[in-house]
Amino acid sequence: MATELQTEQRELAKFIRAGASRGPQCFGSYFDEKGGSCALGAVYDAVYHLPREHGKLIPDHLERLFRCLDEVTKRCPHEGCHKRLPLAPMLVHLNDDHVWTREQIADWLTAESQ
């Protein structure tokens, strides 16, 4: 039986995939001026249905998402990396440091929550 946190992780993966379909991937920030998003930005985009022309309205933090972002700690799945981080920084780490696609991150989250 899936725990509540595992269910939230699967939901998070679903939002990453949905947000990833809305624009290109970016690195180093949640959003960029070209309409791109990182993995966490993709979640925010999918949950809040951000307008395509966001201009200066780029959110600088995520609120009211899922408790699993803070409460779940994971080991980095990238070969040779030994970091252990809470889920939110882990998503940023995989996106920015290992340049994983948002879809790869969502797939990993889904597999981890089974």
Question: What do the predicted segments below correspond to?
Answer:
Residues 1-37, 43-114:
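Domain-length accessory/inserted modules outside core catalytic folds
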